[in-house]
From Swiss-Prot:
<keyword id="KW-0963">Cytoplasm</keyword>
<protein>
    <recommendedName>
        <fullName>Nucleoid-associated protein PSPPH_1145</fullName>
    </recommendedName>
</protein>
<dbReference type="GO" id="GO:0003727">
    <property type="term" value="F:single-stranded RNA binding"/>
</dbReference>
<dbReference type="GO" id="GO:0005737">
    <property type="term" value="C:cytoplasm"/>
</dbReference>
<dbReference type="InterPro" id="IPR007358">
    <property type="entry name" value="Nucleoid_associated_NdpA"/>
</dbReference>
<dbReference type="GO" id="GO:0043590">
    <property type="term" value="C:bacterial nucleoid"/>
</dbReference>
<dbReference type="GO" id="GO:0003690">
    <property type="term" value="F:double-stranded DNA binding"/>
</dbReference>
<dbReference type="Pfam" id="PF04245">
    <property type="entry name" value="NA37"/>
</dbReference>
<comment type="similarity">
    <text>Belongs to the YejK family.</text>
</comment>
Amino acid sequence: MPIRHCIVHLIDKKPDGTPAVLHARDSELAESAAIENLLADLNDSYNAKQGKAWGFFHAESGAYPFSGWLKEYFDGSQDFTSFSRVAIKHLQTLMEASNLSTGGHVLFAHYQQGMTEYLAIALLHHSEGVAVNAELDVTPSRHLDLGQLHLAARINLSEWKNNQNSKQYISFIKGKNGKKVSEYFRDFIGCQEGVDGPGETRTLLKAFSDYVEKEDLPEESAREKTQTLVDYATAQTKLGEPVTLEELSSLIDEDRPKAFYDHIRNSDYGLSPEIPADKRTLNQFRRFTGRAEGLSISFEAHLLGEKIEYDEAAGTLIIKGLPTQLIDQLKRR
């Protein structure tokens, strides 16, 4: 993963309402194994985050100047350090206006993954821990806590440059229930939501269910294809990459690689050729779950119709082949 440019600034903002203080770095970080490890860990943490949203830039304006500065950097009108410094000052201003925000170290990284260039921006926080030093004393230790990554965005620079009609070249952490605490960061990027990741994923899964029904697939084949879809989509979310419908179609049916893709296109589901899969929605598709007072049921989707029968009119489930452990417990009751 070649790192083209990387820099870290610090915005010191206390929760007591005092003005935020900016400590801006004057030069880029030198290449090092530590920087490479940091960015790799950041990517892993970011890709694993649930609740991300996808979108595109607002038109450049006084309220949303970030895309203009990014364009100047990308066109060579200003260097990376200058771009990051003017951007971090804008973030400082927005932080001061937000009562919900706290400061921290802000990372800007321009890197390449495969043939694609990205810009990652993340607000990093620290955690206090302990360490053992060379004298074998236990001492306090402060470290970056990427598990507490709540404000971050990633811009697909290649997509932004080459596909002006795209509405999903920016991804950002939206937070649980779209927390307002993240709004100032989204405004800093100047991003508007263009793609509903969970909604697109639900539509994809609906299209797949319709396809299985239309093809009248045997139970074993349907189960295998379901697993193929979930495995591929889950792998793409871990990589931070979208689900490509044509690639998915070829994996679902190697003998007829266009069959599922043609089904989607001919049925007009309104799906884009590439969609950002939502991990939470995929997990729900993998299993059926339900809870009531004193009762919890969870089973894999492919068991429905095989070991589990659902009677909608009666509101009952019939479970065949109970686990031996459960049978033993029932006998001992």
